[in-house]
Amino acid sequence: MSEAYRQPVLGVIGGSGVYDIDGLEGARWQTVESPFGDVSDQILRGTLDGLEMAFLPRHGRGHVLAPSDVNYRANIDALKRAGVTEILSVSAVGSLAEDLPPGTFVIADQFIDRTFAREKSFFRQGSGRPCQHGPSGQRLAGRSRRRGSGRSGHSPSPGRHLSVHGGAAVLDPGRKQSLSAMGLPRHRHDQHARGQAGPRSRDRLLHRGHGHRFRLLAPRSRPRQRRGGGSRAAAKRR
């Protein structure tokens, strides 16, 4: 069947605390194998409001896999083999931004990958797959905006309003979200994020997605003031 006429199948990867999806009709667990190794768990298939879905718990049911033990390539490959056409990855987060309270959703529309010590490509030598480069930034940004950036609605929690924001993500390895000192060097990344995503980099977030830390960064609203008055840029000119 042509890709243009394929029935869309939404794949959802659940993070910590998200091990299934309530309300799925015809729910059934399906085993899918991958040549990239062990998949985190079986895939839960079903339909929700007429949309076919496939759910995969990133850490396995019962949270049996540490972030460093998750085979991310195998998970993505298994969802593709299950017929998934698009993937939504959900993760629990801790915010570093005062204007992002609990209950806020952030959909990253740009990212800067600073991770290491993990396989990142499906096209290593000997894979037998044709490898070609394609632009990802515009594609990611466009899909993210269409999928909900700037939207709002009602949260399942009584009395809580659900807001959705966009932003640029910086991916770093590690799990340090509970360290208060992690908030100290944020200014060092602000200018870098501004060059990547412009004014859309308005949110800061510490995100434990895919075993790595995500920080959504915002450019400063005004130049930092030096002692004695004047900005740093003005001081350099003097």
UniProtKB/Swiss-Prot annotation:
* Region: Disordered, residue numbers: 123-167, 180-238
One GO biological-process annotation of the entry reads:
nucleoside metabolic process
Under the heading SUPFAM superfamilies, the entry gives: Purine and uridine phosphorylases (SSF53167)
Instruction: List where Basic residues composition bias occurs.
Output: 207-238
Q: InterPro entries annotated for this entry? A: MTAP, Nucleoside_phosphorylase_d, Nucleoside_phosphorylase_sf, Purine_phosphorylase-2_CS
Q: Which Gene3D superfamilies match?
A: Nucleoside phosphorylase domain (3.40.50.1580)
Q: Which UniProt keywords are present, listed alphabetically?
A: Glycosyltransferase, Transferase
**Which is a Gene Ontology cellular component entry for this protein?**
cytosol
Q: Which CDD domains match?
A: MTAP_SsMTAPII_like_MTIP
Question: What is an example of a GO molecular function annotated in this UniProt entry?
Answer: S-methyl-5-thioadenosine phosphorylase activity
The protein's name is Uncharacterized 25.8 kDa protein in petC 3'region
